[in-house]
């Protein structure tokens, strides 16, 4: 093992020591006579020069540098010993003869004899390719002879001592001999090859075992990966681990049939399909706008649609001309019902034709829009009874409330039912069952345009709860204003006052 630790100019800071020329372990005072220190990363041809192989010994005498003679040869110690043995006349040589051959052939090893000679002895004793031969008494001298194992002559590739194939071991040589004998001899006489054949035959069996174990270990994870594409509702309802692994993992199609009513996976029951089927469902078509987040299970609705005359595209508040039918105006706000909340009952007015239908369903919160026979001018408006006071941010407070029109007697019950529906959907905490006369107070309302009603829901203005102190029994709108009412915001064609017509 030769020293590669050398240092460059002592004035140069941060220089890696072994990348320069002079010896690191030189005697003190040797830095004065330095000859041409090298650069750190230079590819100079004198990179393998004098200082690269100088001795470790601090007592080594300072000699003038001879770079060409002191380059370490690119051979391993095993190659050097093999060269010495093969150059001997009898193919055997003593330890001292090996030393002498190396020093004569390579002047690099003429220095630091203690270091490399120790390495030579280690390699002779550790490598099985070198065989120790006892010395004859006939020849003078001392020490045993060293020779090469006959099977180790081909341990270097193509006779080059620069590359060695592998570490020589006698066990490998004996196995190779047995294999060769087994190949040459016929199968009945293969007695020598018997110990080697089970070892070779067991190798593919072990490989098969390994493959089987790997496939078994990987098999439980395969259904989770491959069965994500389950599309049939039967597979989602089975109790097999495949469907149980695939349904929560992300196959939405398998859980769609029971997804709306029960919401088993904790998914919200509201979807785009609900809105689309609300708009285009046939008469009597069932749908369940499941309230998965609100915790309410809503029964399916039967929505029979009536024939829609062209009056659906008329003015928004087409009130009846006679005073007796004061509650019979129709607000055709088709876009508001289906696109702002799918069933937002607070925008629309209910004609008197809905009184009988609503009186059959007194339980408001469980069936908010149960069996509404929609009137001719509404077509899917899904109206609830006059809660236009909830758009309190857009009312005109200057309009004085006229006296309420004579109301038919069965109107309080549908008003309460639809008021509960509005409070259920719009999250109003106040219970509106106590408003008997609040049903069709249509004359007191002044309508802004549809856009302002959209803005009120979009901006979240109508979050105030309706209590008993805020809404009185005579249906006069006494509501606190959360924001400044947008009076005179739009031009005359956009603001409709229902009390003028």
Curated annotation (Swiss-Prot):
Phosphorylation regulates FOXC2 transcriptional activity by promoting its recruitment to chromatin. Keywords: Activator, Developmental protein, Disease variant, DNA-binding, Isopeptide bond, Methylation, Nucleus, Phosphoprotein, Transcription, Transcription regulation, Ubl conjugation. Residues 386-397 have a biased composition (Basic residues). Residues 398-413 have a biased composition (Pro residues). Residues 171-185 have a biased composition (Basic and acidic residues). It holds the Pfam family Forkhead. There is a cross-link at residues 184, 214 (Glycyl lysine isopeptide (Lys-Gly) (interchain with G-Cter in SUMO2)). It is linked to Lymphedema-distichiasis syndrome: An autosomal dominant disorder characterized by primary limb lymphedema associated with distichiasis (double rows of eyelashes, with extra eyelashes growing from the Meibomian gland orifices). Swelling of the extremities, due to altered lymphatic flow, usually appears in late childhood or puberty. Most affected individuals have ocular findings including corneal irritation, recurrent conjunctivitis, and photophobia. Drooping of the upper eyelid (ptosis) is a variable feature of the lymphedema-distichiasis syndrome, occurring in about 30% of patients. This is Forkhead box protein C2. It comes from Homo sapiens (Human). The gene is FOXC2.
């Amino acid at each position: 093992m030769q020293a590669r630790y050398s240092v460059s100019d002592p004035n140069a800071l941060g220089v890696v020591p072994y990348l320069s020329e002079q010896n690191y372990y030189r005697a003190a005072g040797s830095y004065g006579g330095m000859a041409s220190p090298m650069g750190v990363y230079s590819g100079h041809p004198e990179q393998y020069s004098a200082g690269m192989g100088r001795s470790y010994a601090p007592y080594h005498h300072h000699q003038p540098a001879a770079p060409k003679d002191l380059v370490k040869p690119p051979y391993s110690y095993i190659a050097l010993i093999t060269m010495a043995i093969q150059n001997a006349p009898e193919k055997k040589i003593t330890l001292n003869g090996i030393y002498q051959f190396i020093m004569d052939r390579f002047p690099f090893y003429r220095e630091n004899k203690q270091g490399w000679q120790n390495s030579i002895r280690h390699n002779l004793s550790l490598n099985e390719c070198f065989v120790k031969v006892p010395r004859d008494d006939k020849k003078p001298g001392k020490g045993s002879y060293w020779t090469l194992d006959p099977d180790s002559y081909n341990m270097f590739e193509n006779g080059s001592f620069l590359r060695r194939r592998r570490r020589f071991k006698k066990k490998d040589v004996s196995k190779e001999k047995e294999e060769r004998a087994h190949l040459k001899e016929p199968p009945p006489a293969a007695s020598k090859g018997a110990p080697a054949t089970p070892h070779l035959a067991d190798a593919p069996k072990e490989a098969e075992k390994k493959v089987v174990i790997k496939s078994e270990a990987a098999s439980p994870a395969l259904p989770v990966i491959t069965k994500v594409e389950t599309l049939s509702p039967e597979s989602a309802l089975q109790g097999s681990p495949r469907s149980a692994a695939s349904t929560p993992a992300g196959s939405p199609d398998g859980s769609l049939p029971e997804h709306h009513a029960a919401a088993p996976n904790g998914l919200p029951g509201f979807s785009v399909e609900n809105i689309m089927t609300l708009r285009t469902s046939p008469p009597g078509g069932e749908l369940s706008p499941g309230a998965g987040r609100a915790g309410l299970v809503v029964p399916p609705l039967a929505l029979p649609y009536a024939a829609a005359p062209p009056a659906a595209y008329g003015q928004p508040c087409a009130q009846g001309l006679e005073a007796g039918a004061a509650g019979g105006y129709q607000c055709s706000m088709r876009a508001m019902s289906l696109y702002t909340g799918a069933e937002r009952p607070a925008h629309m007015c209910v004609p008197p034709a809905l009184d009988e239908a609503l009186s059959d369903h007194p339980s408001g919160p469980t069936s908010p829009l149960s069996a509404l026979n929609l009137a001719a001018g509404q077509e899917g408006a899904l109206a609830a009874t006059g809660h236009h006071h909830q758009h309190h941010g857009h009312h005109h407070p200057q309009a004085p409330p006229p006296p309420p029109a004579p109301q038919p007697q069965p109107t309080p019950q549908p008003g309460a039912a639809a008021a509960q529906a509005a409070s259920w959907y719009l999250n109003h905490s106040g219970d509106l069952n106590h408003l008997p006369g609040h049903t069709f107070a249509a004359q007191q309302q002044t309508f802004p345009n549809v856009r302002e009603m959209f803005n009120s829901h979009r901006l979240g203005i109508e979050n105030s709860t309706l209590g008993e102190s805020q809404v009185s029994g005579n249906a006069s709108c006494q509501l606190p204003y959360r924001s400044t009412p947008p009076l005179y915001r739009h031009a005359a064609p956009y603001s409709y006052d229902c009390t003028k017509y």
